[in-house]
């Protein structure tokens, strides 16, 4: 995924910023507490496809 997209993409739920996961497989929304998958380089920004962040992930800065 092109990291330049992070400058223009926002979480569709809370409208907050997104952060690329360390392994570059998800876009993380701390505001919504969700992780959106990246499949074949394309972020899938559907709430139904997102996973809920664990408590540890939510607290991780």
Curated annotation (Swiss-Prot):
GO CC, any one term: cytosol
Highest taxon of the lineage: Bacteria
SUPFAM superfamilies: Trm112p-like
Coiled coil regions in record: none
Family assignment from sequence similarity: Belongs to the UPF0434 family.
Full protein name: UPF0434 protein PFL_1779
